Curated annotation (Swiss-Prot):
Subcellular location: Golgi apparatus membrane
Keyword Transmembrane: yes
Tissue: Highly expressed in young panicles.
InterPro entries: Glyco_transf_61_cat (IPR049625), Glycosyltransferase_61 (IPR007657)
Top-level EC class: transferase
Residues in the Lumenal compartment per record: 65-566
Summary of the knockout phenotype: Dwarf phenotype, decreased levels of xylose, ferulic acid and coumaric acid in leaves, and increased saccharification efficiency.
Entry keyword set: Cell wall biogenesis/degradation, Glycoprotein, Glycosyltransferase, Golgi apparatus, Membrane, Signal-anchor, Transferase, Transmembrane, Transmembrane helix
Regions crossing the membrane: 44-64
Name recorded for this polypeptide: Beta-1,2-xylosyltransferease XAX1
Length: 566
């Protein structure tokens, strides 16, 4: 009997000639007898399975990971293939963690996983996020086809730092960590690497005993046989000055019982430093105290307790606006306080760089602060309005403002009035002033200027208050002063995005010609005086006054005007 499933009419609907007819039923039966229905059904089933398998494979390859539809088992498997969290990268992002049992919150709590160094080094990318170069968006970093070279390098650098810390006596027992930079050398500026220690864990500060206790069961950290380390926390490594700095002891104790009891608990880090040395000089107030304090604590955003030794009430009063910007808490007098202050972290000493300069450095400046950042900090702390100089021609009759800083001691500009008159004649609105103890008031005056002019000396430090792109004119005294002029004020001005102009005084423009013959070393070989040290230099070259030749100096004023319009 012929199967009806495969039978067809012998003619097309509507009839037709013989050429339009289908194959006769007999021929169709001949074909169907060669293909059995059961075998055809098995073949179709196998084909469907193959197509389904291919679809599933391709879907797995191009699927986008979704924490909403991922099961707990899949999420656990994903975390096994991803690098664990570390203190540097923070906890695992929420999409890589499973919700805790009984947690009705819609968010997923982060989970800290034990650190596996082999995985961290092999997979330096952020866990759970695709590489920027990945060709498969949405896949976790552990499954990406390409690795991020920059993060691999960062992981390698972090590993090197950890190994270096182990070699240099960094203690890490439980929550305790002690890291000191005591033997750093800057060949050009040896004073630019003072001793600094960072302390983490149970840190107890006893000002009365001039001691910082650290609960350190391991005893590691480079301490002497008594478990002590002594520092003079002044931010200038100057052998002449350091004997006058209060010495503070860091004492490692094995347990809480061996440390004095806390009289006050603090939830923020402490920073202990000295304002001894040259800190009654504005240049040194900045280079040896305020800039190092900014470099050490700015990242804490006010959440730090300042303790000052060699305490000077007038100094604290003078810089109160800056200290309050760096710390939300009243300064503690380390010389008189009788309590025991307990902190989770502490700094003894301050990090610093060269004078009026902040450069990138892996330990001293890991956050890559610059002098531009410090200038911005000053403007915020002192509420200085201007961050750019005047635009010439913007308003009819507007004249650029020049501030000439006068000096009462040495290195006076003897013909200051003539210089001011020449500048006025060229179109400047000139103000002459001497820096005083009222820092906010004088900072506002400097900030209002477009051009600052001064003879080499501490007064030029006030360039830190100028708006960016203002002009600094330094009159450099006679006596091979180019190195000091460039490194103390010229390069810092450029780093602060100021426009710098300098004028070198000749033999006929210095008052030294009245005190020494032209055959004296002052004129014949001033470099030899520098080689004899600061005391000799201070007694000779630094005592001069200057009287500039207006014919020579006028082009400098024109250059300042031109630089202001660039």
């Amino acid at each position: 009997m012929t199967s009806t499933a495969y039978s067809r009419p012998s003619k097309l609907p509507g009839g037709g000639n013989g050429s339009d007819r289908r194959l006769p039923p007999r021929l169709m039966r001949g074909l169907t007898t060669k293909i059995e229905p059961k075998k055809l059904g098995v073949g179709l089933l196998a084909g469907c399975c193959l197509a389904l398998l291919t679809y599933v494979s391709l879907a797995k390859l191009f699927a986008i990971y979704s924490p909403v539809f991922a099961s707990t088992a899949n999420t656990s498997a994903l975390m096994q293939n991803s690098p664990p969290s570390s203190p540097e990268t923070g906890p695992i992002p929420p999409q890589e963690t499973a919700a805790g049992a009984g947690n009705n919150d819609s968010t997923v709590d982060p989970v800290d996983l034990p650190e596996d160094k082999s995985l961290v080094e092999a997979q330096p990318q952020e866990p759970g996020f695709p590489s920027a170069e990945s060709q498969e968006p949405g896949l976790p970093a552990a499954l990406s086809r390409k690795e991020d070279d920059a993060e691999r390098a960062a992981a390698a650098a972090a590993s090197e730092i950890k190994q270096s810390e182990k070699k240099n006596g960094v203690a890490a027992g439980g929550d305790t960590k002690i890291k000191c930079d005591e033997n750093g050398v800057d060949e050009g500026f040896p004073y630019a690497r003072p001793s600094v220690c960072e302390l983490y864990g149970d840190v107890r500060v006893s000002p009365k005993q001039k001691t910082i206790y650290v609960v350190n069961p391991s005893g590691a950290g480079g301490f002497d046989e008594n478990g002590e380390k002594r520092l003079r926390p002044y931010a200038r490594k100057d052998d002449f000055l350091l004997p006058g700095v209060v010495e503070v002891t860091i004492k490692s104790v094995p347990s809480e019982a061996a440390a004095p009891k806390c009289t006050k608990q603090h939830a923020v880090p402490a920073v202990v430093f000295s304002v001894a040395g040259y800190t009654d000089n504005f240049f040194h107030d900045m280079t040896d105290a305020m800039i190092p304090l900014f470099l050490t604590t700015a990242h804490l955003k006010g959440e730090v307790q300042i303790l000052i030794t060699n305490y000077k009430p007038w100094w604290v009063q003078k810089y109160t606006p800056l200290l309050r910007k760096l710390s939300n808490y009243d300064v503690i007098n380390f010389d008189e306080d009788a309590g025991v202050h307990c902190f989770p972290q502490g700094y003894l000493g301050l990090y610093r760089d060269r004078d009026l300069i902040i450069s990138p450095h892996p330990t001293r400046n890991p956050r890559n602060y610059t002098m531009v950042d410090y200038n911005r900090f000053l403007r915020d702390a002192l509420e200085l309005r201007r961050d750019r100089p005047s635009v010439l021609g913007e308003e009819p009759g507007m004249r650029p403002r020049m501030l000439i800083i006068s000096r009462a001691g040495t290195r006076k500009l003897l013909n200051l009035e003539e210089v001011a008159a020449a500048a006025t004649e060229l179109g400047f609105n000139v103000t002459v002033a001497e820096a005083g103890a009222d820092v906010p008031a004088f900072a506002a005056l400097v900030n209002s200027a477009d051009v600052l002019l001064a003879v080499h000396g501490a007064g030029l430090t006030n360039q830190i208050f100028l708006p960016a792109e203002a002009v600094v004119v330094q009159i450099v005294p006679w006596g091979n002063m180019d190195w000091m002029a460039t490194n103390f004020y010229g390069q810092p001005a450029r780093d602060m995005q100021l426009r710098y102009v300098e004028y070198y005084v000749g033999e006929e423009e210095t008052s030294l010609k009245h005190n020494y013959s032209r055959d004296h070393m002052v004129f014949k070989d001033p470099k030899a005086l520098h080689a004899q040290g600061w005391q000799t230099l201070a007694a000779t070259i630094m005592k001069q006054d200057v009287e500039v030749n207006l014919t020579r100096f006028r082009p400098i004023l024109l250059q300042a005007l031109d630089r202001l319009q660039q």
